[in-house]
């Protein structure tokens, strides 16, 4: 193989390994950052329809972000029913601990956030 082809191949492999993203595409983030746990609790606590108890976040497994006119956050999370009854208490990440940490579901939430307009909303939330 010519040295030119080898150089092009090495540059392509290096670029791919650096996690370069497509403009407007989703970019992986570190799921251990505290801000993502806060967003996960925000999304999960908003899901009350048809439930007697709030669900709570057990762990944030994956996070992807997308720059739009604001920011989209796609969170893959594990949730579990909490000890907090809807209508009796306000959701709190500290107080609404799992009833049974073994009973988990995996969910994907998309949160749209426009900080300069003080706007944050859950645009999608689905569980397996």
From Swiss-Prot:
Chief localization: secreted
Disulfide bonds: 84-96, 107-127
Its job: Inhibitor of cysteine proteinases with broad specificity for mammalian cathepsins, including endopeptidases (cathepsins L and S) and exopeptidases (cathepsins B, C and H). Also inhibits endogenous cathepsin B-like and cathepsin C-like proteinases. Does not inhibit human legumain. May mimic specific host-derived cystatin(s) to interfere with its/their function in controlling cathepsin-mediated proteolysis.
Domain Cystatin: 29-116
Tissue-level expression: Widely expressed. Detected in salivary glands (at protein level), gut (at protein level), ovaries, and Malpighian tubules.
Coiled coil: none
Leader sequence residues: 1-19
SMART domains: CY
Protein keywords: Disulfide bond, Protease inhibitor, Secreted, Signal, Thiol protease inhibitor
Protein name: Cystatin-2
Compartmental location: Secreted
Listed GO MF terms: cysteine-type endopeptidase inhibitor activity
Lineage of source species: Eukaryota, Metazoa, Ecdysozoa, Arthropoda, Chelicerata
Induction (UniProt): Down-regulated by a blood meal.
Keyword Transmembrane helix: no
């Amino acid at each position: 193989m010519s040295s030119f082809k080898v150089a092009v191949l090495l540059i392509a492999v290096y670029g791919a390994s650096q996690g370069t993203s497509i403009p407007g595409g989703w970019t992986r983030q570190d799921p251990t950052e505290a801000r993502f746990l806060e967003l996960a609790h925000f999304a999960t606590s908003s899901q009350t329809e048809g439930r007697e108890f709030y669900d709570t976040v057990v762990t944030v497994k994956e996070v992807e972000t997308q720059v739009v006119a604001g920011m989209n956050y796609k969170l893959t999370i594990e949730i579990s029913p909490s000890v907090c009854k809807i209508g009796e208490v306000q959701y709190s990440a500290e107080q609404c601990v799992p009833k049974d940490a073994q009973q988990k579901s995996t969910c994907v939430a998309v949160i749209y956030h426009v900080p300069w307009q003080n706007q944050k909303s859950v645009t999608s939330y689905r569980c397996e």
